UniProtKB/Swiss-Prot annotation:
Source taxonomy: Eukaryota, Metazoa, Chordata, Craniata, Vertebrata
Chain segments carrying region Disordered: 53-80
Protein name (record): Myocilin opposite strand protein
Domain of life: Eukaryota
Protein's organism: Homo sapiens
Length: 80
């Protein structure tokens, strides 16, 4: 079997210091979370504002009962 050289198996990171790489990634993730949280909060606020304008109050929606369907001709006792 052919042996692989150690140079081919090494990982080449642009940062020599592992601590600085970890710190950089943590800062990036925190920044992303803040941006995503801000965007989702803004979206929720916009949706709630639109819902208030378009939808009836929630206490009205569950109280409304649809009208009963008309009787079927097969069940009508007046027709022989």
């Amino acid at each position: 079997m052919a042996q692989k050289s150690l140079a081919n198996n090494s990982i080449n990171l642009p940062y020599k210091d592992l601590t600085s790489e970890v710190t950089r990634r943590r800062v990036t993730m925190i920044t992303r979370k803040e941006i995503i949280t801000q965007k989702s909060d803004e979206a929720k606020e916009m949706l709630s504002h639109l819902d208030l304008e378009q939808a009836p109050p929630p206490h009205r929606t569950y109280l409304t009962v649809p009208p009963a369907p008309p009787p079927s001709p097969a069940e009508d006792p007046t027709v022989s």
